[in-house]
From Swiss-Prot:
GO molecular function: actin filament binding; small GTPase binding
Superkingdom to which the source organism belongs: Eukaryota
Region (Disordered): 1-275, 328-350, 975-1119, 1465-1484, 1596-1790
Organism: Emericella nidulans (strain FGSC A4 / ATCC 38163 / CBS 112.46 / NRRL 194 / M139) (Aspergillus nidulans)
Chain intervals with Low complexity compositional bias: 39-62, 187-203
Record note on domains: The DAD domain regulates activation via by an autoinhibitory interaction with the GBD/FH3 domain. This autoinhibition is released upon competitive binding of an activated GTPase. The release of DAD allows the FH2 domain to then nucleate and elongate nonbranched actin filaments.
Name of the gene: sepA
One Pfam family matching this protein: Drf_GBD
Domain FH2: 1141-1564
Protein name as annotated: Cytokinesis protein sepA
Length: 1790
């Protein structure tokens, strides 16, 4: 709460100190005789008194202290309102005089402390006042205090806490100006001080005794003594202030008596406020301050704390106290002047020494010692001080003094040499500050009148209208606009006079020429569309707000122009003259440029200018026309038309003598044209200037005709020629310099070629020839392509002409037929002759006109076709067109016969014409459809072959076979399913609908998958005639027509993963082999979609529409977002971190840090009991120190001291240097230029400016010098660097001295100063050009090689026939696998990545492996595509768009550098450093750079076209960024996957061959054992051999086997036994026949070979879990031992009973297998695929299967080309061969 608010709350509102006391009584009636203070106060009590009601106690100073102290004399902290007991006063005082006239309700002598008065102090020593009579008695100097009741702290200091939370208390010094307390800065303040006397109005009667009685003194029960004017003061405060008694009293005292007592003036303010060097002096001053403030009475602890302050803090308090004294004295003098207006003989001189007074500012301005900060303070004072202050400044000639400084700046700017940047910027800053001050001055009447009274003020402002600083020009425009409006036209005249004065002084021709010129240059400096493109240097350096500033400047300029033109309201001719002067300066061009800002305020001003112009010209013409003599009309319609103006003048002067002079003047004007070029322009300019003088003679002060003609024409022409000559000389010098630079560059180039020698030059020329050869080949290819495109366009044009003629002829014949029908109908109905005329027939169209127009169009088309045919070659018309031509243009005989026949048909049967009409329409539609639907052009010039393209033809027998096979493989579709074709696909159908067909669908799906993976697929049908239909599958009956080529939407996507099995994923799975980890738990035939989950619980089935997408995986267990800990921590509040108190015992040296994680909330942890107080911690540390623990810790864990390198003399010198640039930039300088660290800064700068090779070849240095912080100079760095720099763009820059020595700067700052700062105007372009000389060749090699590689790879993709065949094979097999609604004509390259995702039923072989195996075994001629497109692997990570951007950047960089050399920053070497060789170095390389840029452009265009074409060729979207980026990557991934599949397949085949060899060896051993058993009448027992096989399998697997694996192995054992012992077609009881082994081996060998070979398309992967097949890599002695054990067992078991049981068990097993097979056909279980009946009666033999499908055997031939019938019988125990009987490989007929 502010202090005034507190005072009002505590006293004014509650006690008799309030304002409302006696408010209703007049001032004179408020005091009666007995209550008058004249009778109460001593005679001297009125000295220096002031009105309390109209005074302003504003001498409030705040002193901020940094400690919680109580500075009062009493030991009170807050000040409960108490009264001092009378016993505390000294004994020589008078007793109080009672006052009885006050009302008792308001005279409470003592108020009880309210709660608001307690605890207000910041200190915590006590709360209630402690009264010490003895102390008061010692400190009391006078008997009675006057004024209000003294506060508890009588030293005059009020303590108030800061609202901002600072630590120290704020002590407010309240003192009335003029009182001793105010003078000394020591007064009192209590809660009752701020009252009615705070009114700011001053009392007129300052010496009145009545007025000295404020509301503070009315209720006081104390009487003032002679020595006090307000209140008691401590006796110890008289060392710094003297108190004087008033010399006069009474109401009639003179003004002199009101002069305040003189105070000891401080002679040197700066010295008085400067801190002493000796801290002991500061301590002494602080002791004095403590005595002065009464702080000695503070408690002992507070005094000790204050005495322990550091010297800096003590000086802060002393400095604040002294500052308060000075400000109080200054305000006292100011108030005295405002009150009494005394100005002794030395008043003005005294005020000139007062800092902040108007006279002081004027003195500083006149001495030219005023600083920018003081100018800014003056500007603020002129805006905020009272009017009297501003008036005093004007009367002290302040405005003229400011103007003189402004004139000096402008004179230096115009006539003097170009100043260095620091001084120039300083002058511009001062100019801006002065203009701000002048604007503030003229914002009132005194300043504006003074400006009109002194012409030099306006002249100075007009001169600043041409200032380089945009802010200054804007302010001056505003001030001049105001002056034009001031004093009813006088200001406008003064401004025009000042403009003419400046024009003559600067040697300009026109009044507004210089001004309009700089306005136009400023507006032209704005970049295009407000950007930095094409912007001027001023606009670029202006920062973010430059656009707004520029628009505001344009607004100010337009307002000033309108004010200058429109100010003379009653003088039309003067307005037109001023406007004409503006128009001659190009104001119309300027207005059109300003309109480009699109700023509403500017547009309004422009519209205002144009409207007033039109109105004035209209008034002028009306006046002139009304004044013509003899009613001769001389009216001018357009003032911009010289003919009308001349006619008007001639008509007005006709018949007068003036007409002769006018004619003579025109004739002389006509003679000017004989002069050439610039002379004529200058002549007209001179004539215009002279005519303006003549026309406005004596209309303006300086436009006197005699004065204007006192010059020679030659002198004027000489002055007019100067500009053109200078411009011409400048252009010539610039051209000559560029020629010289080019010659030097050519010389250096020749020198470099000579240095290369013969070998180097030959090598370089050979390289260039190779590049040129490549470019020529590239251009030749492009020309061939363009020729082919041109031929295509020509052919299409001819085709279009034929189509148009065809349609026109068809339409013509249709209309003629319709007309014939109408005529025949008219004849039948016996209509009149008029109605039969086709011209009178009614209809929508006028048929006769239409027929005529069509005939003309046909003739025109025929002529056009013939003419174009001569140029492009004649194309034969189509048959239909030729027929129509013959029909319309044939011989007369056939045509007449044809028409007669048609007429007979129409007359007999009108319907016949309809048939003929229909025929024509059908033919037209067919032909049009044929020609419009063709993308190729072979059919256009032959007969229509649309019938050939409707449906591909094939052999009926082959079609029947294929249809039967497809019908067998495609799932059956019910009638209900046929109705749902438009509904979602089967993956999107509900699970309930799919569950109804679960059995049948499961069987069919299984069969289809098995066929796709195991059985050889049928060969693709022969491709149809049309390439667009090659991908269509043979349609099932009834065959629908195939889709037309190119019709419809995009081709269907590649086969997605099959849908989840019916019934969802949560059902109980049938007993398939255990899936590998990561698969589904459902039936294995459909492979899992990507991202599937394994194990229960399975995810829910995908929703409709998203079945094929990848479901987002749920978060894994354990990563649930927001657990108990997160909730717990969130529920806790923010921990309150207590600041730990540092112990006084600290290690002597730095120790290693112990990094730990702090507990956030120690209140609820074990550390809550460890929280000790600071005293306890201190004791703990003391105890640890006594025990030696801390010393041991300090000894063991001492941190290693880091040595500071460079801490010697060099570092000290560096510290002495001044650093301006940032630390980061300085460090970057040291890093980049580390190689040159041993050289001085001047040498490094010389090498950089000379463009030495060691600089240009150092990439680190070049990259650093091109960085943004080197090219862009921050504003603060620019200001600090300016005094050290030199402007190389100015004249004679080499001899210009720097303001400050650059050796004061650090080494890095000096390098920055000499290079990037001084050459900043062309540094960026310079470094870009130099970097180009070193980078254009390697960049060209790098980028062009990539461009050529992209073109080469794209062409290899386009030319690779093998790749297209492989993709076609993939498409055919995919369509074979897919349903009818998923057939595709092509697929995108992204589908290739999914080939490896489609796996077989055992998740072992992928579709990619299958395709690779088919191509390698069946189509080996296609395998070379991997070498043909191998380049895609090297380009898979290449971003083609980024490559194109790099190439464009390369080309644009060379173009930009060339533009800079031609007409940019590098075009004018005059602006360069004198030793800079950038132009010579750059010119040498630009010829080769331009040539390489042109070649790069050709390579880029070729690459872009080839790449886009190859993307379109492969069906990709060349406008999609993702597709462009991943095109090569997709093919590279497919190629890498192909190679992996090839390696995998070869490894599997090799493993299978080794396995077969091992098993063949085992089978021979088993055959020997069986033969021995037969010789000994001991047949082999199936159970015994099965036990041995089971034992061997268990030994290999070493793990328990699943039931289905045991079943498969059991069936394999039975199969093996039948292959060895049982012949095909024999009965089981004939096992012991002699021919059994031989016959069985032969027949079974065929079937087994078939089975083995047919499994070629799905090789097995070895499973280590127990279902793996035995391979030869395992120890073969196990097989040998097993064979020997089998022989022993056969020898030991010759029991016939066992033979019988073995036969019965075999029969039982066969019976069970048949039963399982029958059940499997209806149940759809997995075992139905693995069980095959062995009865030769029910199953077809393998030979039947081979004869049924001869094509399939070609796909499953052995890899080595062996005859399968020659192979011996084999036993394959691999997972696919052993699990699947041989009859499963036969084609299914179900």
């Amino acid at each position: 709460m502010p202090t005034s608010d507190k005072s009002r709350q505590t006293s004014a509102g509650k006690s008799f100190f309030g304002r409302k006391l006696h408010k209703e009584r007049p001032v004179e009636d408020r005091w009666d005789a007995h209550g008058s203070w004249e009778s109460l106060a001593p005679p001297s009590s009125a000295a220096g008194s002031r009105s309390s009601r109209y005074s302003k106690r504003s001498s409030i100073q705040s002193v901020d202290f940094g400690a919680d102290i109580d500075p009062s004399l009493l030991s009170t902290s807050a000040g409960p309102i108490t009264s001092i007991p009378f016993e505390s006063l000294s004994t020589d005082t008078q007793s109080p005089i009672p006052v009885d006239y006050l009302s008792k309700a308001e005279t409470s002598p003592r108020k009880e402390p309210s709660p608001g008065h307690l605890a207000k102090g910041v200190g915590d020593f006590h709360q209630y006042p402690a009264w010490d009579p003895s102390a008061m008695r010692n400190h009391q100097q006078f008997s009675h205090p006057t004024g209000p009741r003294p506060p508890p702290h009588a030293a005059g200091v009020a303590m108030s806490s800061s609202a901002t939370g600072d630590k120290g208390a704020r002590y407010q010094q309240w003192g009335r100006p003029g009182s001793s307390a105010g003078n000394a800065g020591l007064s009192h303040h209590s809660s009752s001080t701020v009252d009615s006397s705070t009114n700011s109005r001053m009392s007129i009667d300052q010496a009145s005794i009545h007025s000295s009685l404020s509301s503070n003194t009315r209720g006081s029960s104390y009487i003032s003594t002679d020595g006090s004017s307000r209140t008691t003061l401590p006796s110890h405060s008289n060392d710094r202030s003297n108190y004087y008694a008033a010399m006069n009293s009474g109401r009639g005292s003179s003004a002199q008596g009101a002069i305040p007592p003189a105070q000891p003036r401080v002679q040197n303010t700066e010295q008085y406020l400067t801190r002493p060097r000796d801290d002991r002096v500061v301590d002494q001053l602080f002791l004095e301050l403590m005595q002065k403030r009464g702080w000695q009475n503070l408690p002992e602890q507070a005094r000790r704390q204050m005495m322990a302050y550091p010297a800096s803090k003590k000086w802060t308090l002393v400095h604040q106290d002294r500052l308060t004294e000075l400000q109080g004295e200054q305000k006292r003098k100011q108030k005295a002047r405002e009150t009494h207006g005394y100005d002794g003989p030395s008043g003005i001189l005294e005020r000139a020494d007062e800092e902040g007074s108007p006279e002081w500012y004027v003195k500083k301005v006149m001495d030219d010692t005023i600083t920018s900060k003081q100018l800014a303070s003056l500007s603020v004072s002129l805006r905020t001080q009272p009017i009297s202050w501003v008036k005093a400044f004007v009367e002290a000639q302040g405005q003229i003094a400011l103007t003189n400084v402004l004139v000096k700046i402008n004179r230096k700017k115009v006539t003097g040499p170009v100043p260095a940047p620091p001084s120039g910027d300083k002058d511009l800053d001062r100019e801006y500050d002065i203009v701000k001050c002048l604007k503030a001055l003229m914002n009132n009447k005194y300043g504006a009148d003074d400006a009109l009274a002194h012409q030099q003020i306006i002249v100075a402002l007009i001169s600043s209208l041409l200032s380089p600083r945009l802010n200054t020009r804007k302010l001056v425009s505003e001030v001049l606009t105001f002056l034009c409006h001031w004093a009813e036209g006088q200001g406008h005249e003064r401004v025009l006079q000042a403009m003419d004065h400046v024009k003559n002084h600067q040697g300009e021709t026109g009044r507004f020429d210089a001004w309009m010129r700089i306005v136009e240059v400023t507006i032209d400096g704005r970049g295009k569309m407000g950007s930095l493109v094409g912007a001027s240097e001023e606009y670029r350096s202006g920062g973010i707000g430059m656009e707004n500033l520029l628009m505001e400047y344009a607004v100010s300029t337009m307002i000033l122009i309108n004010m200058l033109v429109d100010a003379p309201e009653n003088d039309l001719q003067l307005r037109c003259h001023i406007r004409a002067q503006f128009i001659s300066c190009g104001i119309k061009r300027l207005l059109s440029k300003m309109e480009g800002f699109q700023y509403e305020v500017i547009d309004k001003q422009i519209e205002h200018f144009r409207e007033n112009e039109a109105i004035d010209y209209e008034d002028l013409l009306q006046r002139e026309s009304s004044s013509t003599k003899d009613s001769i009309e001389g009216e001018v319609k357009d003032m911009t038309d010289p003919l009308q103006i001349t006619d008007a003048i001639a008509s007005r002067l006709n018949g007068t003598r003036a007409h002769d002079y006018f004619l003579s003047a025109l004739q002389h004007l006509l003679l000017i044209r004989e002069n050439s070029g610039e002379d004529g322009l200058r002549m007209y300019q001179l004539v215009d200037a002279m005519l303006s003088y003549v026309a406005m003679d004596r209309r303006l002060p300086d436009l006197d005709l005699r004065q204007g003609l006192t010059f020679t024409v030659q002198s004027l022409l000489d002055r007019l020629h100067t500009d053109a000559e200078a411009r011409r000389a400048y252009d010539e010098s610039l051209e000559a310099r560029q020629i010289a630079e080019a010659a030097l560059a050519e010389r250096d180039e020749m020198k470099a070629q000579v240095e290369l020698g013969a070998d180097g030059l030959v090598r370089k020329l050979q390289k260039q020839i190779e590049e040129q050869t490549g470019i020529i080949e590239l251009q030749s290819r492009q020309n061939e392509m363009l020729k082919a495109e041109l031929a295509d366009v020509q052919r299409l044009r001819a085709q279009e002409l034929q189509r148009n003629e065809l349609e026109t002829r068809e339409l013509y014949l249709m209309l003629r037929d319709a007309q014939d029908i109408a005529a025949s109908n008219a004849k039948k109905s016996n209509m009149g002759e008029a109605e039969t005329d086709p011209a009178h027939m009614r209809g929508i169209l006028d048929r006769e006109k239409l027929l005529t127009r069509l005939e003309k169009q046909l003739e025109r088309t025929k002529t056009q076709f013939k003419l174009e045919g001569k140029v492009w070659g004649q194309h034969d018309p189509s048959d239909r067109l030729r027929e129509l031509r013959e029909q319309m243009d044939g011989d007369a005989g056939p045509r007449e016969a044809f028409e007669e026949q048609a007429r007979l048909n129409l007359s007999l049967n009108p319907v016949g014409s309809v048939y003929r009409k229909k025929t024509y329409i059908q033919g037209m539609e067919d032909t049009a459809t044929e020609e419009l639907g063709q993308t190729d052009d072979e059919v256009v010039y032959a007969k229509a072959r649309l019938v050939d393209l409707h449906r591909p033809r094939m052999d009926p027998e082959q079609a029947t076979g294929l249809l039967g096979e497809i019908a067998a493989k495609v799932p059956k579709i019910d009638a209900d399913d046929a109705k749902d074709e438009g509904k979602p696909t089967e993956s999107e159908q509900p699970a309930e609908g799919a569950a109804t067909k679960g059995d049948e669908q499961g069987v069919d799906d299984t069969v289809a998958v098995d066929k796709a993976t195991a059985a050889p697929p049928p060969p693709p049908p022969p491709p149809p005639a049309h390439p667009g239909l090659s991908g269509a599958a043979p349609p099932p009956p009834p065959p629908p027509p195939p889709p037309p080529p190119g019709a419809g939407a995009a081709p269907p996507p590649p086969p997605p993963p099959p849908p989840p099995p019916p019934g969802g994923l949560g059902g109980p799975p049938p007993p398939p082999p255990p899936p590998p980890p990561g698969g589904f738990g459902g039936p294995p035939p459909p492979p899992p979609p990507p991202g599937g989950f394994g194990g229960p619980p399975p995810p829910p089935p995908p929703p409709p529409g998203g079945a094929f997408g990848v479901p987002p995986p749920p978060p894994p267990p354990g990563t649930v977002i927001g657990g108990w800990r997160a909730n717990y921590l969130a529920s806790q509040g923010a921990p309150s971190h207590a600041i730990p108190v540092m112990s006084s015992i600290r290690p002597k040296k730095k120790l290693k840090a112990l990094h730990w994680d702090k507990v956030d909330t120690p209140q609820v942890t074990v550390w809550a009991t460890h929280g000790t107080t600071p005293q306890e911690k201190e004791e703990k540390y003391v105890e640890l120190a006594k025990r030696g623990v801390l010393d041991e810790v300090e000894r063991l864990f001492m941190a290693k001291e880091t040595r500071i390198f460079g801490g010697g003399v060099a570092a000290k010198q560096r510290k002495d240097k001044k650093q301006i640039i940032s630390n980061d930039l300085s460090k970057n300088f040291q890093i980049a230029l580390s190689k040159f660290s041993q050289f001085p800064a001047e040498e490094v700068v010389r090498r950089i400016i000379h463009c030495d090779a060691e600089i240009l070849d150092n990439m680190v240095v070049m990259e650093f010098l091109q960085r943004d912080e080197m090219c862009t100079v921050p504003e603060n760095v620019s200001k600090l660097m300016a005094p050290y720099s030199k402007d190389w763009t100015g004249p004679d820059a080499a001899n210009t001295e720097r303001e400050q020595d650059p050796s004061e700067l650090t080494r890095e700052d000096q390098i920055y100063l000499y290079t990037a700062f001084e050459l900043n105007h062309y540094w960026k372009a310079r470094m870009r050009a130099l970097a180009l000389t070193r980078s254009f060749e390697p960049d060209y090699e790098h980028i062009s090689a990539k461009l050529r590689e992209v073109v080469r790879v794209s062409e290899s993709l386009r030319d690779s026939v093998s790749l297209m065949n492989v993709l076609g094979l993939i498409l055919d097999i995919g369509n074979f696998m897919n349903d009818a609604n998923k057939q595709a004509q092509g697929f995108k390259l992204s589908s290739l990545a999914r080939l490896g995702m489609v796996k077989d039923d055992k998740n072992e072989t992928t579709f990619a492996d299958l395709v690779e195996r088919i191509v390698r075994n069946q189509y080996p001629e296609w395998e070379d595509f991997t070498e043909q497109i191998s380049g895609v692997i090297g380009l898979q990570k290449l971003n083609v768009d980024q490559l194109r951007t790099d190439a464009k950047k390369y080309i644009d960089n060379i173009k930009n550098v060339q533009a800079s050399l031609d007409a940019g920053n590098l075009s004018d070497p005059k602006k360069f450093h004198p030793q800079d060789r950038v132009s010579q170095i750059t010119q040498r390389s630009m010829k080769d750079a331009r040539r390489k840029a042109e070649q790069m452009q050709l390579y880029l265009e070729e690459m872009v076209k080839t790449y886009d074409d190859i993307m379109v060729f492969y069906g990709e979207d060349n406008t999609d960024d993702g597709a462009r980026r991943d095109f090569f990557a997709k093919l590279a991934a497919f190629l890498q996957e192909w190679k992996k599949s090839k390696e995998k397949n070869i490894a599997l085949e090799e493993a299978r061959r080794r396995t077969e060899a091992s098993l063949a060896r085992k089978r021979i051993n088993v055959g020997l054992a069986n033969g021995a058993g037969a010789a000994g009448d001991a047949p082999v027992s199936p159970a015994t051999s099965g036990a041995m096989d089971s034992l061997l399998e268990k030994l290999r697997a070493a793990a328990p086997q699943a039931k289905d694996q045991r079943d498969r192995r059991r069936r394999a054992r039975l199969k093996e036994r039948h292959q060895v012992r049982v012949a095909s077609g024999q009965k089981i009881p004939d096992l012991e026949g002699a021919e059994a082994p031989g016959s069985g081996g032969q027949n079974s060998g065929a079937t087994d070979t078939n089975a083995t070979d047919s499994s070629l398309l799905s090789p097995t992967i070895q499973e280590p879990e127990g279902g793996s097949s035995p391979i030869a890599s395992q120890s073969e002695d196990v097989a040998d031992r097993a064979a020997s054990m089998l022989q022993d067992m056969l020898r030991n078991s010759p029991d016939p009973e066992r033979t019988r049981r073995r036969r019965e068990s075999a029969e039982e097993e066969r019976r069970k297998r048949r039963l399982r097979r029958r059940n499997g056909a209806t149940s759809g279980s997995k075992d139905s695929n693995d069980t095959t009946p062995l009865s030769p009666v029910t199953e077809p033999t393998s030979t039947q299967g081979e004869s049924a499908e001869p094509e399939n055997l070609s796909l499953s031939s052995p890899p080595n080309g062996e005859d399968p019938t020659l192979n011996p019988p084999t036993i394959v125990l691999s997972s696919d061969a052993s699990d699947t009987p041989d009859d499963e490989h036969r084609p299914s007929t179900s």
